[in-house]
Each structure stands twice: as C-alpha cells, then as structure tokens.
Amino acid sequence: MADKVRLGLIQLCGCSGCHISLLDLHEQLLDVLPNLEIVYAPIIADVKEIPECDVFLIEGGARNEHDEHLIHEIREKSKVVIAWGTCAVYGGIPGLGNLYSAEQLKKTVYGTETTDNVGELPSDEMVPPLTNSVMPVPSIVDVEYVIPGCPPRPEINAGAIVALLEGRDPELPKKIVCDECPRTKENVIPETFKRTFEGTPDPEKCLFEQGYTCVGMGTRAGCGALCPSAGVPCRGCYGKTDEVLDQGSSLANTYAAAGDEALKISDKSALFNRFTLPAALISKKQE
C-alpha cells in the first residue's frame, strides 16, 4: 500500500472496552500498524481538533449534546465511519437509561447524597447537557459499517481492519450464539424460569432448556459463546442478527412459547433489550 490509511478513534458514551479489545490483538497489531497512521485518538494522545480521516472508529453512542456534536463532525471529516462496539451500534448498557427521563436520571445520580456527592446538580459548564435519550451512532449519521460486540472480539477487530486495508467490506457472523454454543440442545420449552444464581446448571445441557434466561437464540454470533460455555446465560451483547428488525421483539416471541411462565420473568426490558434498547422499535419509555 502506497499511502497509509489515516485512522481516527474516539470513545463517547462507552467504557473504552473496544479500545482495549483492539490492544488485545497484541503482536498481530504489528502486521497492520505499518499501513495505518493514527491521527486522532484521545485515549492515546491529547489532540484538540479532529482532522480529515480515511477511517474513523466511534466507540459509544451519544448521551449528551457534546457527543452528538462530535459524531456530526466526525462524519463530515471522514470517508468511512464505523460504529464500533455495541454501545455505538445499538446504545449498549447505557441505553437502559432510556427507561427514564434525563431529569429523572440526573435527580437520582446527583440528587442522592453520598460521601463524595453533596446532592447538587452540576452546571452545564461542568457537564454537557444530556440528550433526551441515548442515541446509537447510526441514528445520528449514516455509517458505512457496524461492528457490534461488548466488546468485539480482537479477531473481529482484526478482520475488519484487514478487510478495509484490502479494499473489502468487513463481514459479520450470520449465525446466532446458539450455533457456537457446545451445550446439548433437545428443543424443549422450559416449564419455569430461574435466576442465574438459583441452583447449579447441568454443564452439558442447554441453559435455556434448563430454565435459565439465556438469549443466545436471538443474538448474533461472534463471541464464541464464551458465557454459556462458562455456565453463564448469554445476555445478548452482540445484538440482533440480520434476519430480524428488533432483538427484543424476537426474543419476546421465543419466550412466549413458555406461556404464563414467561410473564413472571422480572425486568423483561433489561433481559430482551439489555444492550439494544435505543435501537429497538420502541426505544424508550412511553409517557
């Protein structure tokens, strides 16, 4: 490659886990770094202005007006914009804040006195004004690609970067987590549902069929089914597959097969749309 690809990275309403996942490539980074020029990455260096970029990876969605402004500026200055990680693609865990108004959130967070919080709301000069809801990047600007995952596995990051360097479109897994899960499935509907801490699951059998609230059947593959393999139900962090419009609706339809028992599940919003509420068909609490 004659010219290096000018790469930008930023963390908005996210935890920097996607950046760490990129670093988790370790020595593999040495294969791609010669073809990249990192021109903007606040997590690495303090650069005041966003420069022109060939590719920009945005981690996190928008929770405040400053986030939204930066997303628009990045779009204007970048040839290729990638929503990087589930928070950017779907809203992620912060998106559960959409179940409450911005004022309710501020009152709870800053209005509850603690040992290091005097119960005063910060001014807009200290904290940028919150948007009415958490917004995924694709709901604000057009993006060329999305890379879901909380965080994306290092090999998915590597595959996307190599594809772009070679002039190809990055590809995402088409299957669901259940397809990667080694547990035995007998296609039975559980008679009742249990919390994760209740009982000890059979290490060989499907967690959902044992009554644990696993959502692997409605979640895009790519993680290698790490959680179910370790005895922890899938929580849906890779979001929906290409076959459905809404992860939560798809999962609710699956769980409905259990009849009234499914209605007894606590906090269904956080089960079915734990990582994807801002991108759901009903993306926030209806007044």
UniProtKB/Swiss-Prot annotation:
Would the keyword Oxidoreductase be found if you checked this record's keyword annotation? yes
Superkingdom in the source lineage: Archaea
According to its UniProt record, the EC number is 1.12.99.-
What InterPro entries is this protein classified in?
A: Hydrogenase_assoc-protein (IPR051349), NADH_UbQ_OxRdtase-like_20kDa (IPR006137), NiFe_Hase_small_N_sf (IPR037024)
Query: Which chain positions lie within coiled-coil regions?
Result: none
* Keyword Hydrolase appears in the UniProt entry: no
Q: Give the EC class as a word.
A: oxidoreductase
A GO molecular function term, named singly, is:
iron-sulfur cluster binding
Per UniProt, the keywords (alphabetical) are: Oxidoreductase
Q: Which residues cross the membrane?
A: none
* Family that this chain belongs to: Belongs to the [NiFe]/[NiFeSe] hydrogenase small subunit family.
Assembly: The F420-non-reducing hydrogenase vhu is composed of four subunits; VhuA, VhuD, VhuG and VhuU.
PANTHER family found in the cross-reference section: COENZYME F420-REDUCING HYDROGENASE, GAMMA SUBUNIT (PTHR42845), F420-NON-REDUCING HYDROGENASE VHU SUBUNIT G (PTHR42845:SF2)
Q: What is this protein called?
A: F420-non-reducing hydrogenase vhu subunit G
Q: Which organism is it from?
A: Methanococcus voltae
